[in-house]
Amino acid sequence: FIKEILKTFLEKENSNILIIGHNAILRCLILSLIGRPKKGFRKIRLENASFSILNLSKQNDSYKTQIECLNQTSHLNNCIPSKIGDSRIFLIRHGETNWNKEGRFQGQIDIPLNKNGKDQAEKTGEYLKDINFNKAFSSSMKRPYETAQIILQKNKDLKIRMIDSLIEINHGLWEGKLESEIREEWPYLLKNWHEKPEEVIMPEGESISNVYERSIKAFREICLSQEYNDLTLTVAHDAVNKTIICDLLGI
């Protein structure tokens, strides 16, 4: 079945393929597409009428997969699925900054939220209004901390613990630059960053492995701090959150 899907995809550009199936079948399909066909089955939860989106990009005679979303249920009446397990962690990326809007690599430059970023945090807080968080963690940079503060504005007494190990990847000499500027000076390195980011060390910056080591250590400490029925907010960055999710899925 997967081979037939990929054949259809690889022969046509801009395909949108709708697959409606069962819990176990869809979990196996997702795991196969991300290259983990025998692992992670119990790590994926799929609610009734939820949807997941996977972006496939042609790469020679093969493909690469990007997870857009898993188990999306915001279109249903119950915004947040019921809790399974002893505690729950909500992992959130910070809202928009002016550099995000302009398409600049910001990394560890401490840019605050812009108006749209604050609005995004407000909407996230409204979406999570029925969640009574009792623990909160944030990267020690302005944009995630501001995001956490806005989300928790109805629970201002809850202390947000800032964690240095959750700060964004260091883009080195790329920080503050537009992609077009980087392409002029480091065209080959930028191409590799888009195709195989795990193999790239940015000039005077960090690698994905560097971020993985510090972010996973910090996240595991957060997990070990959990007590029964804890509801924990954690706000960090794009690269940090991706490494955490990849570690959880075993990819």
List PLM regions with ranges.
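Amphipathic, non-transmembrane alpha-helical scaffold segments
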Residues: 2-3, 118, 141, 183, ...
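Phosphate-coordination/substrate-recognition cap region in phosphate-metabolizing enzymes
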Residues: 4, 122-190
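Generic beta-sheet signal
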Residues: 8-9, 13-24, 89, 228-239
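Acidic, low-complexity terminal tails and accessory targeting/binding regions
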Residues: 31-92, 101, 126-127, 131, ...
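Glycine-rich N-terminal loop/short-helix segment of MobA-like nucleotidyltransferase
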Residues: 97-110
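Short catalytic helix/loop segments, enriched in acidic residues and glycine
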Residues: 109-125
